[in-house]
Amino acid sequence: MKEEEKTRLVIVQGPTASGKSALALELAERIGGEIVNADSMQVYRGMDIGTAKPSQEERRRVPHHLYDIVDPKVNFTAADFREHASRAIADIERRGKRVILVGGTGLYIRILTQGLVASPGGDDNIRRELEDQAHGEGLESLHRRLAAVDPVAAARLHPNDGVRIVRALEVFLLTGRPLSAFQEAHRFADEPYRCLKLGITVERELLYRRVEERVDRMIAEGLVEEVRGLLSAGYPATLKAMGSIGYREICAHLAGEFSLDEAMRLIKQNTRQYAKRQMTWFRRDSEIIWVEYPGKFDSILSTVMGFYH
């Protein structure tokens, strides 16, 4: 497909608490756009406060897509996201509107815009053995094992990212080839969209202060009650969705493992670390145009309008 024939996407990305949702909303109102979520946690129904979803008032201002689309018990994957997002984008374009993709899950954005890696299927027995090792010896042992056979993948993954560490080892044990080799061979060649990537840059101390304020606000708005309600409704702490930042710490607090103050301290600490990992991911993408928001909105709007014209 020729470049000029591709659907145009404005992508707003950056670390958590950087102001992505606010920028996406302001842009959508100014350019006749609709917002598509690219946050791996905001797809889940009933997980609202801890994922910092847009409010109902904000959603009434412009149409929002891919929020509250699956039950927390569903293991929603990057491939699932690509399928849902592709359909939403096609629908928005068909109605003559502009698409604004917003979120901090870099993998989702990359797979949507650059294609899926053709890697082998899974093996339940191998996965269970790896999960048993993680449970018995700790994730650090799995990460060291991965580093020995696929140092490229190990360097990309946080030592606590159990799901992806297990997957990378599973691929190696099934095929004898590192997962990074499959990714290198693929090189994410299929690019169906023409993209303008905007990244919000925030000075570190300001970002960390926003993180602290956001966590305090989540607790004040009822995060503990939200988690308690999910647990009571039959969503156990062992679910993948319930293991995300904010939910896992409150689950542990409700189980009597530590105080609410300690849970809040851990949420803030883990969120800061997550924001740092997000920035590391996004900084590797040379196509991102880094912008200041809200201070330089007029300049951002000018860049976006130039992209369409």
Curated annotation (Swiss-Prot):
Job description of the protein: Catalyzes the transfer of a dimethylallyl group onto the adenine at position 37 in tRNAs that read codons beginning with uridine, leading to the formation of N6-(dimethylallyl)adenosine (i(6)A).
Binding locations of ATP: G14, P15, T16, A17, S18, G19, K20, S21
Gene coding for it: miaA
Site feature location: Interaction with substrate tRNA: T105, R127
Keyword Magnesium listed: yes
Binding residues annotated for substrate, in chain numbering: T16, A17, S18, G19, K20, S21
Similarity-based family: Belongs to the IPP transferase family.
Record region (Interaction with substrate tRNA): 39-42
Name of the protein: tRNA dimethylallyltransferase
Segment forming the signal sequence: none
Organism whose genome encodes this protein: Geobacter metallireducens (strain ATCC 53774 / DSM 7210 / GS-15)
Name of a matching Pfam family: IPPT
